[in-house]
Amino acid sequence: MNSIYEKLTTCLASVREKTDFVPETAIVLGSGLGDYAEQIKIETTIDYKDIKGFPTSTVPGHKGRFVFGYVDSVPVVIMQGRVHYYEGYPITDVVLPPRLRGMRGGKKLILTNAAGGLNTDFNPGDFMLISDHIATSIPSPLIGANIDELGERFPDMSEVYSRRMREIVKEKADKLGIKLREGVYVQLTGPQYETPAEVRMCKILGGDAVGMSTACEALAARHMGLEVCGISCITNLAAGLSDKKLNHKEVQETADRVAKQFTELITAVVRAV
């Protein structure tokens, strides 16, 4: 058995020992957005450290646990914090969670993150619906022997982010009076924030927001046939676009400021998808 797939099956067995809850939709909460998990009707929680072989998050604002429960009547699993490539994990560990959720039975995945705005029309506190991504700065999680149990060798990526789900997000944001941007997300490795020159590069490539997660997870999820939606919270302007130095505290403060809108939007989307 492929060693990566063997690790996945070990983690899945560990989760099944702890709960038989089967979610319809999975949600990944990015930096500063983790409090949403406290708003749902919680059935059970599992800390990442209690899952055999599972990577654990080391970043402030990422609690590091699965929260199983209901958004109204919709069964969901929320990943309260994620692991990042810059934490030193192999890319196959970084995408282990979305793969695990696919193996668990869920077919819809909502990815959220905190991101820096590249588009000068964006402001801190805006939400950006991800229409596509650029992830050439990080290794593909599909490199190596293909895991046939997960998906085909050469998966199509012409619609990584579901058009159907994007239309739902736009409709719900409009009804809630939430200003929603749409654009291309660029994933860089981190943990350092991007340089002004890197920001110019990302803008030339067509990027609207930049961060250190999400694209690799979306790629792995699409390989498995999951329907994916991505939403960025623009927590700061990227380096060189303002006079302020970048810091993680600003990310948390901006996320706190828009927490109510974030809760309303994600809840409405989960009900509809």
Residues covered by each model-derived region:
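Active-site/ligand-binding-proximal alpha/beta "capping" segment
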Residues: 166, 172-208, 266, 273
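His/Asp/Glu-rich mid-to-C-terminal helical/loop segments that flank catalytic regions of hydrolases
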Residues: 239-273
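Non-catalytic positions within long, well-ordered alpha-helices that form the structural scaffold/packing
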Residues: 101-105, 203, 222
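Short acidic/polar active-site loop segments enriched in Thr and Asp
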Residues: 107-108, 208, 227
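Metabolite-binding pocket within alpha/beta catalytic cores that recognizes anionic/polar moieties
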Residues: 1-157
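Zn-dependent metallopeptidase/amidohydrolase metal-coordination segment
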Residues: 212-250
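Polyanion-binding loop/helix "lid" in catalytic or ligand-binding cores
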Residues: 150-161, 173, 187, 199, ...
